[in-house]
């Protein structure tokens, strides 16, 4: 009750009173001069009372310092009543004011003790709530108070808009400011209390008990509490962010994130659960929960927005989230003039809730405390949710317009429900940290859903600021962060669908890349750097991870980039040819081994099961044996090490491998050899087709601007005759061979009369450049240009949902109880001395899958038409295979990393020689001359 009396003495009102703002603003503005005349008298009175105030504050500070030792006694009366078997008094206003303004935690208090105390109170409250309905009553009381404060802010805002242009409209009456400040701090503490109880319920109960706790067991008066709670929070957050409501915005964004966190404590839905027709039947007065394992608050919000797609509250809420992301407004400092005007004692009482707020959400914590981060987390949760009827927030996201695009603004109807933001400011906010997990996911959804943002990104001339940090992640963290790598590849694939992007990245020159360790890259185009890293990723994936999803995405990006390859750097050209060499060796080796397996002499019909297993293991070894070196086989011990790792991981991740074995490279010993042959040969044939198509298109249409690629191919043309007998590869190989034969023949005649000293790399490069310009360029064949387009799969939530919530788990600044989280694996921080955050990129969702269900990244990459001059038409659809269990990948990587690096260094010796010839003028050998 202390705050109520203090507010009255200070000229304010208790939380819950209405404000006649127009009259109050007018009357108090008239009294401004009188208030100014009384300032000196007030200062004198303050000086006279300084001694009393000092004594009061000293006593208060002493009480705070000792508060941790007697929480049970000082706060037990009200809290014990709240959590007991007895019902709360009818006058909740008085009871909650006394309880909430007693919440004060000093900065030195023991956090574990406080959280333990609150958890114990939550446990007692929940155990008695079905009988007492105390939690339901304070929820309804909180909703009413929040709605009342929301209405006060709306009234003040409308009043200030009416007085716009007046000199006095910027001056908020001091008594109104005091009341708003008091009411906000009251609701801040109220939110913290409700959030604590709600969080305990969500973390420790199943969906049925959660619904019972929030709606009551039998009383219809509480049935709409979850709906009313979500609607009231959404209504408040739809208001403009102001200094007088900043703290409450902050805690409500955290609170709604807690309510949505039921998704962390439920397994991913099965196909049958995913396509339930009606998850909720919502009415404003009553609703019924139908679905099992339902995310109650997310479904309520989705159903509400789905049934009211043009709700201005929803659009204002989303608009404010984007505004928060763009502006990242810092928390306001407490006004000294405000505290001075109400006296030190009263201001201390008003600061009690603020101290509790700072205790639970300390601003010195580096994670999860900015308004940008909280808004991003909430936005990601909303757009990623797999709502059976279709996520309405993704539709809202797709309709957001660029307010800087004047043409659309002139043609648009201001009465339409539309969101307009600055795409420039949003883009600049994202590229401040383009490689962070939350920004990568936000960028993915914006590029995928919003055409305005997509067009704006394509128009930027500084794409290196966006792409280089992502490319660096692909280079440095390809093995350690598979989820993040997959999202980056998808983002680049979406961007590469536009020819303007491909043209820009190939024309943008990066002068030096310091983080690239293999070579000193100087004056390489951004597109060239991207190609080099993608090729390195493919080679690494072939030798270790063997994940076809990564192959598909990397090759699709390379294919899209190939339509604009120009003045390719020697090192980039060598790496592209190296990729062709490795794929060719794998293809030849695999085909040879499969022919041996298919031979009757290799199969004993009396012992078919054993032979199938042995032969499959041999094929697996042959696939792994083609390393990134020039050698055709690995050491036997190395092959056995790979095999042991696969067997070990298979036993650890049995339920995950059930869904992966059908699509991983030769993981299943029981796989029928005929099916294996068809699958693996087809996959490698498709990969080779793409690489050959890239080379063929470049030589056919842009040979004059890529002499370094021709030079590199002349060193490795022995692989092309191998594919002349392959049905889908023969036309491409034949066309490439014809072009290379032309250069070889012309080169042979040109150097016949030259001495060995005169036959330098510079001479040969000059000759290639001259001859390439004389090659006839056929008319562009649109059907022959490789075009890959990204399409999101219907099961993409299986990949993204755990990813989103693991990021929130790590970076929201919230203390989560890990023992019941089922969406992704966690570490019990209480059992280790130096806890580290859960890696958001290395987890496997805890989901019970049937054998025919796949866990895969959200990719479905297809080519439309892929033909070239002198080649046959072919519509190719790359097989989408799931990502292997991340822990399987990591164990392989940790054991083979050093070995693979040594092999790559040895395998690149020939590339070094070719590149050195191209760049320094070293002479070709006689054998290379004749080729």
UniProtKB/Swiss-Prot annotation:
Residues 27-49, 601-618, 859-876, 889-901 have a biased composition (Low complexity). One of its GO terms (cellular component) is Golgi apparatus. Residues 839-858, 919-931 have a biased composition (Polar residues). A lipid is attached at residue 2 (N-myristoyl glycine). Residues 1-53, 599-618, 839-931 are annotated as: Disordered. Keywords: Lipoprotein, Myristate. One of its GO terms (biological process) is Golgi organization. InterPro entries: Dymeclin. Belongs to the dymeclin family. This is Dymeclin. It comes from Dictyostelium discoideum (Social amoeba). The lineage of its organism: Eukaryota, Amoebozoa, Evosea, Eumycetozoa, Dictyostelia.
